[in-house]
């Protein structure tokens, strides 16, 4: 007689996406029925995001070092085409945002108090910050979640261990698998974590605060939807020469949904790593491309910077010609690649883009304040687009390389 699996075993083996959907619905219901009850379960979401953020730096460092150390000689990692896809995708997002802003011009009532923050003075400061992140103390890089530094030291250690004995390489490979197992366990807790995140978000913010900026929000979300459902699939089709939507929808469902609620590309790195493993991608490739993507693949950030900057220009009565808009796309694309190196991310890079039009820092910071008000949805959608695109482009490059080899 076969023994029936326990409830815990059934939950552990069940569909994670379905469980997350149940968590979202339960969170909305709880926030609607009892605001105090919803606020009391906020710690579940904080615990989940905290666990992901805690494991992600260690996972990236160990995986990168182990994959490079164990890499066979002359093995191809396909990193060059992936980086090109990341940069092209980010620039395409900025151009899409410009077109959306021209089609649906947005103006803002700039009467808010300027947000208290310290935006970077220019592109030079963003690059300066990134270069110093590169040479950060490796222990400090892991503690603070500085993924530029983690990648640099992980690659350095991996290259140094490339000529080590097989037993040393095996130890690193075993540690890498051990950390991956811990990540799988944390990801299985996603439904509980997302239940807490959704409950607290609806209870504390609701939609009343963002109702006044609905037009701006719709333009932002529209640009991100076009990027996710039209531009990205077109780029993927160009690479793999087949229907891109099965891959795109898989990545949006399994990476984008989690990223939407955690609102952190760094916290979503373990989720993306697990998805790449599920898609049977080359570990030597995705162990480097996913954390790199969390740093430089910032299509969502480019959209946010561009649309809010053009909204500021429209509000000030500044006429923007097409050449200036193209220049803005380049600036937004480059700035977005440095968004992970700035506290406050894409929003605090808006003053940098506003400087193109001679908009004062005081006015620009009022636009940033508007960004923080709609941030509960804008930041979630931006992170969902950024993070899911990391896997989409990595998978597309890997499949294109395989097709080329088999031709």
From Swiss-Prot:
The chain crosses the membrane at residues 14-34, 48-68, 82-102, 141-161, 192-212, 218-238, 290-310, 316-336, 363-383. Pfam families: SDF. GO terms for cellular component: plasma membrane. GO terms for molecular function: neutral L-amino acid:sodium symporter activity. GO terms for biological process: serine transport; threonine transport. Coiled coil: none annotated. It comes from the Bacteria. It catalyses: L-serine(in) + Na(+)(in) = L-serine(out) + Na(+)(out); L-threonine(in) + Na(+)(in) = L-threonine(out) + Na(+)(out). Belongs to the dicarboxylate/amino acid:cation symporter (DAACS) (TC 2.A.23) family. This is Serine/threonine transporter SstT.
């Amino acid at each position: 007689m076969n023994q029936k699996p326990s409830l815990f075993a059934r939950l552990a083996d069940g569909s994670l996406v379905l469980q997350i959907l149940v968590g979202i619905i339960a969170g909305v219901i709880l926030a609607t029925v009892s605001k105090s009850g919803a606020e009391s379960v906020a710690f579940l979401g904080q615990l989940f995001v905290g666990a992901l953020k805690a494991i992600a730096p260690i996972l990236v460092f160990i995986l990168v070092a182990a994959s490079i150390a164990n890499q066979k000689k002359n093995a191809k990692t396909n990193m060059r085409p992936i980086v090109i896809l990341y940069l092209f995708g980010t620039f395409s997002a900025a151009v899409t945002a410009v077109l959306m802003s021209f089609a649906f011009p947005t103006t803002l009532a700039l009467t808010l108090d300027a947000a208290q923050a310290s935006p970077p003075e220019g592109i030079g400061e963003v690059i300066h910050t990134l270069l110093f992140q590169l040479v950060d103390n490796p222990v400090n890089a892991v503690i603070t979640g500085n993924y530029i530094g983690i990648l640099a030291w992980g690659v350095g250690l991996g290259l140094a261990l490339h000529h080590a004995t097989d037993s040393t390489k095996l130890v690193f490979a075993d540690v890498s698998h051990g950390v991956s197992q811990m990540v799988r366990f944390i990801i299985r807790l996603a439904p509980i974590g997302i239940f807490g995140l959704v409950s607290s978000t609806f209870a504390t913010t609701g939609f009343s605060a963002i109702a006044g900026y609905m037009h701006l929000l719709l333009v932002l979300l529209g640009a991100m939807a076009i990027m996710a459902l039209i531009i990205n699939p077109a780029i993927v089709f160009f690479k793999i020469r087949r229907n891109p939507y099965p891959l795109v929808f898989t990545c949006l469902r399994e990476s984008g949904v989690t990223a939407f609620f955690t609102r952190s590309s760094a916290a979503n790195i373990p989720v993306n790593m697990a998805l790449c493993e599920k898609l049977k991608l080359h570990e030597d490739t995705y162990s480097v491309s996913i954390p790199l993507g969390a740093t430089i693949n910032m299509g969502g950030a480019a959209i946010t910077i561009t649309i809010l900057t053009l909204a500021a220009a429209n509000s000030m009565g500044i006429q923007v010609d097409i050449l200036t808009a193209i220049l803005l796309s380049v600036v937004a694309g480059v700035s977005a690649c440095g968004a992970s190196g700035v506290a406050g991310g894409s929003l605090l890079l808006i003053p940098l883009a506003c400087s193109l039009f001679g908009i004062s820092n005081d006015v620009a910071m009022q636009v940033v304040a508007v960004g923080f008000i709609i941030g509960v949805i804008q930041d979630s959608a931006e992170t969902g687009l950024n993070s899911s695109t990391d896997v989409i482009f990595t998978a597309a490059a890997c499949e294109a390389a395989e097709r080329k080899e088999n031709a």
